[in-house]
From Swiss-Prot:
It comes from Xenopus laevis (African clawed frog). One of its GO terms (molecular function) is F-box domain binding. Belongs to the protein-tyrosine phosphatase family. Non-receptor class subfamily. Residues 28-176 form the Tyrosine-protein phosphatase domain. The gene is styx-b. GO terms for cellular component: cytoplasm; nucleoplasm. Pfam families: DSPc. This is Serine/threonine/tyrosine-interacting protein B.
Protein backbone atom coordinates (compact mmCIF):
# COMPACT_ATOMS: atom_id res chain seq x y z
CA UNK A 1 0.00 0.00 0.00
CA UNK A 2 1.43 3.38 -1.00
CA UNK A 3 1.95 6.18 1.47
CA UNK A 4 -0.30 9.21 1.18
CA UNK A 5 1.25 12.05 -0.82
CA UNK A 6 -0.20 15.52 -0.52
CA UNK A 7 -0.31 17.95 -3.41
CA UNK A 8 -0.54 21.72 -3.07
CA UNK A 9 -0.93 24.62 -5.51
CA UNK A 10 2.04 26.86 -6.26
CA UNK A 11 2.41 30.19 -4.50
CA UNK A 12 1.51 33.11 -6.78
CA UNK A 13 4.54 35.02 -8.01
CA UNK A 14 4.84 38.78 -7.86
CA UNK A 15 3.33 40.37 -10.96
CA UNK A 16 5.79 43.23 -10.81
CA UNK A 17 8.82 44.36 -8.86
CA UNK A 18 7.97 45.00 -5.23
CA UNK A 19 7.61 48.61 -4.17
CA UNK A 20 10.33 49.96 -1.87
CA UNK A 21 9.08 49.83 1.70
CA UNK A 22 8.66 53.11 3.54
CA UNK A 23 7.66 53.64 7.16
CA UNK A 24 4.22 55.19 6.43
CA UNK A 25 3.23 52.02 4.54
CA UNK A 26 2.76 50.21 7.85
CA UNK A 27 -0.41 52.29 8.32
CA UNK A 28 -1.82 50.95 5.03
CA UNK A 29 -2.92 47.48 3.95
CA UNK A 30 -0.97 45.40 1.45
CA UNK A 31 -2.21 42.64 -0.88
CA UNK A 32 -0.39 39.46 0.17
CA UNK A 33 -2.17 37.02 -2.13
CA UNK A 34 -4.65 37.86 -4.89
CA UNK A 35 -7.71 38.97 -2.94
CA UNK A 36 -6.08 38.69 0.51
CA UNK A 37 -4.97 41.89 2.23
CA UNK A 38 -3.10 42.37 5.51
CA UNK A 39 -2.96 45.64 7.41
CA UNK A 40 -3.56 47.59 10.62
CA UNK A 41 -6.83 48.79 12.07
CA UNK A 42 -6.12 52.22 10.59
CA UNK A 43 -6.79 50.65 7.17
CA UNK A 44 -10.28 49.60 8.29
CA UNK A 45 -11.45 52.79 10.00
CA UNK A 46 -14.56 54.65 8.86
CA UNK A 47 -12.46 57.21 7.01
CA UNK A 48 -11.04 54.44 4.80
CA UNK A 49 -14.33 53.15 3.37
CA UNK A 50 -13.64 54.53 -0.10
CA UNK A 51 -10.22 52.83 -0.17
CA UNK A 52 -11.71 49.50 0.92
CA UNK A 53 -14.41 49.72 -1.72
CA UNK A 54 -11.93 50.71 -4.41
CA UNK A 55 -9.87 47.61 -3.57
CA UNK A 56 -13.00 45.47 -3.74
CA UNK A 57 -13.01 44.34 -0.11
CA UNK A 58 -16.06 42.20 0.74
CA UNK A 59 -14.92 40.39 3.91
CA UNK A 60 -12.95 41.47 6.99
CA UNK A 61 -11.28 39.49 9.77
CA UNK A 62 -11.10 41.84 12.77
CA UNK A 63 -8.70 40.65 15.48
CA UNK A 64 -8.83 42.24 18.90
CA UNK A 65 -8.68 41.51 22.60
CA UNK A 66 -11.71 42.28 24.75
CA UNK A 67 -10.00 45.34 26.20
CA UNK A 68 -9.48 46.68 22.67
CA UNK A 69 -13.14 46.39 21.68
CA UNK A 70 -13.82 50.04 22.47
CA UNK A 71 -11.51 51.27 19.74
CA UNK A 72 -11.06 48.31 17.34
CA UNK A 73 -14.51 47.87 15.85
CA UNK A 74 -16.19 46.23 12.84
CA UNK A 75 -17.14 49.55 11.26
CA UNK A 76 -18.96 48.39 8.14
CA UNK A 77 -21.17 45.47 9.16
CA UNK A 78 -23.86 46.58 6.70
CA UNK A 79 -21.37 46.51 3.81
CA UNK A 80 -18.88 43.74 4.53
CA UNK A 81 -19.03 40.32 6.13
CA UNK A 82 -17.02 40.20 9.36
CA UNK A 83 -15.27 37.54 11.40
CA UNK A 84 -14.35 39.01 14.79
CA UNK A 85 -11.74 37.06 16.76
CA UNK A 86 -10.80 37.61 20.41
CA UNK A 87 -7.03 37.09 20.40
CA UNK A 88 -4.48 38.68 22.73
CA UNK A 89 -1.06 39.62 21.37
CA UNK A 90 0.54 37.56 24.11
CA UNK A 91 3.18 34.81 23.69
CA UNK A 92 1.09 32.42 25.81
CA UNK A 93 -2.07 32.92 23.72
CA UNK A 94 -3.11 29.72 21.91
CA UNK A 95 -3.50 31.13 18.41
CA UNK A 96 -3.52 27.72 16.70
CA UNK A 97 -7.15 27.23 17.71
CA UNK A 98 -8.15 30.13 15.44
CA UNK A 99 -6.38 28.93 12.30
CA UNK A 100 -9.16 26.64 11.07
CA UNK A 101 -11.95 29.20 11.44
CA UNK A 102 -9.94 31.94 9.76
CA UNK A 103 -8.93 29.64 6.89
CA UNK A 104 -12.54 28.62 6.28
CA UNK A 105 -13.59 32.27 6.29
CA UNK A 106 -10.83 33.28 3.85
CA UNK A 107 -11.49 30.32 1.55
CA UNK A 108 -15.20 31.07 1.54
CA UNK A 109 -14.47 34.65 0.53
CA UNK A 110 -11.97 33.90 -2.22
CA UNK A 111 -13.97 31.03 -3.68
CA UNK A 112 -16.92 33.36 -4.26
CA UNK A 113 -14.80 36.03 -5.92
CA UNK A 114 -14.56 38.27 -2.86
CA UNK A 115 -11.59 40.01 -1.29
CA UNK A 116 -10.69 39.89 2.40
CA UNK A 117 -8.78 42.20 4.74
CA UNK A 118 -7.19 40.68 7.86
CA UNK A 119 -6.32 43.28 10.50
CA UNK A 120 -5.55 43.54 14.18
CA UNK A 121 -4.32 46.73 15.78
CA UNK A 122 -0.95 47.27 14.10
CA UNK A 123 -1.14 44.51 11.48
CA UNK A 124 2.17 43.13 12.69
CA UNK A 125 1.71 40.14 15.03
CA UNK A 126 -1.73 38.53 15.40
CA UNK A 127 -3.07 39.22 11.93
CA UNK A 128 0.29 38.38 10.37
CA UNK A 129 0.32 35.03 12.19
CA UNK A 130 -3.11 34.14 10.78
CA UNK A 131 -2.02 35.05 7.25
CA UNK A 132 1.21 33.05 7.60
CA UNK A 133 -0.73 30.01 8.85
CA UNK A 134 -3.18 30.33 5.96
CA UNK A 135 -0.35 30.40 3.41
CA UNK A 136 1.43 27.46 5.07
CA UNK A 137 -1.63 25.23 4.96
CA UNK A 138 -2.94 26.36 1.57
CA UNK A 139 0.35 26.01 -0.28
CA UNK A 140 2.05 23.33 1.82
CA UNK A 141 5.11 25.34 2.83
CA UNK A 142 7.14 25.77 5.99
CA UNK A 143 6.87 28.63 8.45
CA UNK A 144 10.09 30.35 7.37
CA UNK A 145 9.09 30.34 3.70
CA UNK A 146 5.60 31.63 4.48
CA UNK A 147 7.01 34.33 6.76
CA UNK A 148 9.41 35.50 4.04
CA UNK A 149 6.62 35.54 1.46
CA UNK A 150 4.43 37.75 3.66
CA UNK A 151 7.30 39.99 4.76
CA UNK A 152 8.23 40.69 1.14
CA UNK A 153 4.81 42.31 0.82
CA UNK A 154 4.42 43.79 4.32
CA UNK A 155 7.91 44.33 5.64
CA UNK A 156 6.91 45.33 9.18
CA UNK A 157 5.37 42.00 10.25
CA UNK A 158 6.74 40.62 13.52
CA UNK A 159 4.68 37.84 15.19
CA UNK A 160 5.54 37.47 18.87
CA UNK A 161 7.81 34.61 19.95
CA UNK A 162 4.93 32.44 21.16
CA UNK A 163 3.12 32.75 17.84
CA UNK A 164 6.32 31.91 15.95
CA UNK A 165 6.74 28.73 18.00
CA UNK A 166 3.15 27.69 17.34
CA UNK A 167 3.49 28.41 13.62
CA UNK A 168 6.59 26.24 13.48
CA UNK A 169 4.66 23.42 15.15
CA UNK A 170 1.66 23.95 12.90
CA UNK A 171 3.39 22.46 9.87
CA UNK A 172 3.21 18.99 11.41
CA UNK A 173 -0.36 19.58 12.56
CA UNK A 174 -1.82 20.61 9.22
CA UNK A 175 0.10 17.94 7.30
CA UNK A 176 -1.19 15.25 9.64
CA UNK A 177 -4.73 16.59 9.43
CA UNK A 178 -4.74 16.70 5.63
CA UNK A 179 -3.11 13.27 5.38
CA UNK A 180 -5.70 11.68 7.64
CA UNK A 181 -8.48 13.31 5.62
CA UNK A 182 -7.13 11.70 2.44
CA UNK A 183 -6.48 8.23 3.88
CA UNK A 184 -8.75 5.28 3.19
CA UNK A 185 -10.16 3.23 6.10
CA UNK A 186 -7.50 0.56 5.45
CA UNK A 187 -4.72 3.14 5.49
CA UNK A 188 -5.98 4.57 8.75
CA UNK A 189 -4.99 1.31 10.43
CA UNK A 190 -1.35 1.78 9.40
CA UNK A 191 1.33 4.02 10.95
CA UNK A 192 1.11 7.57 9.65
CA UNK A 193 3.72 8.47 7.03
CA UNK A 194 3.57 11.97 5.61
CA UNK A 195 5.30 12.68 2.30
CA UNK A 196 5.81 16.43 2.34
CA UNK A 197 9.23 17.39 3.63
CA UNK A 198 10.32 17.60 7.25
CA UNK A 199 7.44 18.02 9.65
CA UNK A 200 9.19 18.47 12.98
CA UNK A 201 7.75 17.11 16.20
CA UNK A 202 3.99 17.02 16.64
CA UNK A 203 3.83 18.32 20.20
CA UNK A 204 0.34 19.73 19.90
CA UNK A 205 -2.66 17.60 19.12
CA UNK A 206 -5.10 18.19 16.31
CA UNK A 207 -7.62 19.09 18.99
CA UNK A 208 -5.87 22.47 19.34
CA UNK A 209 -7.31 23.48 16.02
CA UNK A 210 -10.80 22.30 16.88
CA UNK A 211 -11.06 24.49 19.98
CA UNK A 212 -12.60 27.59 18.57
CA UNK A 213 -12.13 29.69 21.68
CA UNK A 214 -13.96 32.92 22.18
CA UNK A 215 -14.94 34.28 18.83
CA UNK A 216 -17.83 36.04 17.22
CA UNK A 217 -18.95 35.92 13.61
CA UNK A 218 -20.80 38.96 12.34
CA UNK A 219 -22.41 38.20 9.03
CA UNK A 220 -24.47 41.25 8.22
CA UNK A 221 -24.01 41.64 4.47
CA UNK A 222 -26.09 43.66 2.06
CA UNK A 223 -27.59 41.67 -0.82
Amino acid sequence: MEDVKLQFPSLPLCKEEAEDWTYPMRREMQEILPGLFLGPYSAAMKSKLSVLQKCGITHVICIRQNIEANFIKPNFQQLFRYLVLDIADNPVENIIRFFLTSKEFIDGCLQTGGKVLIHGNAGISRSAALVIAYIMETFGIKYRDAFTYVQERRFCINPNAGFVHQLQEYEAIYLAKLTIKMMSPLQLGRPLCIQSGSTGSLKRTLDDEDELGNMQVSAAHEG
